[in-house]
Regions:
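PRPP-associated nucleotide enzymes
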Residues: 1-170
Length: 170
């Protein structure tokens, strides 16, 4: 069917800024202190959203496959808005919310460039703004029609389990 490779948008800073303006315009009146981007996909979007809204930008990252806040601090009571590239299931956002709350912050919602959530499986955290809503099917690897054709190799492009998978190939 289709795959949203958001890194392609990041190649063009001016276009990325235009897309994030759509999101920024929707959240500029929100009471937010910090924009938090889950690594890798959310870092650029968090930075750009923070730039356009005058907020602080930070990111979470995986250490031993666990989402953590390694390089920054969240102050107790700070209102944090998560900025994602694509939200399909909301799993990365849930991990990021956990990190925010463990550090004393308050998660006020998610923003994303592309919202791929389904009505029957909504995001566990409210999506307060997106630039685009796409209704694309989600497939288990063994059910993916593109994979079945054998024209493209099945590769994992997200950051989850990357370190674990790299160890298995060494």
């Amino acid at each position: 069917s289709a795959y949203c490779q958001m890194a392609y948008l990041q190649q063009y800073p001016d276009r990325c800024a235009e897309v994030m303006k759509v999101v920024a315009d929707k959240v500029k009146e929100m009471d937010v202190d910090v924009i938090v981007g889950p690594a890798m996909g959310g870092i650029v979007y968090a930075y750009e959203l923070a730039r356009q809204t005058g907020k602080r930008a930070i990111f979470t990252e995986r250490v031993d496959n666990v989402m953590t806040l390694k390089r920054f601090a969240i102050h107790p009571g700070e209102k944090c808005l998560i900025a994602e590239d694509v939200v399909t299931t909301g799993i990365s956002s849930l991990e990021t919310k956990r990190v925010i709350e463990e550090n004393g912050g308050i998660c006020v919602g998610i923003t994303c460039v592309v919202d791929r959530t389904k009505p029957e499986a909504p995001s566990p955290i409210p999506i307060v703004a997106s630039a685009l809503k796409l209704d694309l099917p989600n497939y288990a690897p063994e059910e993916c029609p593109i994979c079945k054709e054998g024209k493209l190799p099945l590769v994992h492009l997200g950051s989850r389990k990357m370190k674990q998978e790299a160890k298995q190939t060494l």
